[in-house]
Amino acid sequence: MRILAVDDDPYILELLPMIALKAGFSKVSTAPSGAAALDILKNSEIPFECLLLDINMPEMDGIELCTHIRAIPSYRKTPIVMLTAMKEREYIDRAFEAGATDYASKPFDIVELRTRLRLANELMVARKSNLHTSSESLPQSPSVGSGTPSPLSEAVMIEGIKNLVDERALENYLKQLSRAGLGGSHIFAVKIHQIEAIHARASVAEFSYALTEVIDAISNALGTTSYLMSYVGHGAYIVVSNGPRFESSEEMEANIQTILDEKNSEYDNGDPLDIEVSAGNPLQPNTSVALLIQETFERAIARAEARVEEKKNGPRPINIHSAYGVPK
């Protein structure tokens, strides 16, 4: 795995190749600034496969650098590990929103950093073996592109959408919040009804368009709330929100649905693309180990799926007073 490490501290730039070598990675290049890193990436004939970025650098910090790197097509999915002594939620949120894959704290825990590098290598290998055309670009309308969508189970990654990350990055985000002692997040899932029928009928572009419409509706419903979101396949989205906790998802669900209904989405031929969604009640994440984070994601999806089944048996009224924090 070819690694580029970026830090304005010469000592760190000497240390990182030694740590990487202990983890089995000998191909490490270094850059002393964001500008120098971008020059190296631009002029490198062989793409780097992992990037280590210090957040606290002068002129161009690591978060801004991460944003610039993600704008380079060949680096949209490259694992990016942020390096920093900063543990405030603001920096963690901004780093993952900019496209970070993982986060390592300074002063370095050597074992932890080796683990981060090995996980980045696993992710890089997995992505290389699962390349597919449906995630190469972001369709802007259902009239662009054709063909058959990827399998319904596939966690299609739609590029270029703010706060949308892959599931691995979402897991790492929650783990970093836990390591920094920052609580207060809650998780809920949104599920598209009859996703099998939409998937069976839609082209690649139409299916991506449908997924994007829901992402946009969720984002608008959340408003100014800080959040990260991941599409995990089968028409399900996981949302990690740092806003005020709500006991019931009914009002959130109604807001998302209203936004979708106002879009009047269509297939290529002008037929209506009717999208109905259900949202599960939120829950607190258990971030002690990765397995428990996965279990939390599964529980969130199960709640959304249970809501889908509940609505099949008839609507229930929205209780606005209980939707935001009044104990049941």
Describe the function of each predicted region:
Residues M57-M60:
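Receiver (REC) domain active-site loop signature in two-component systems and cognate sites
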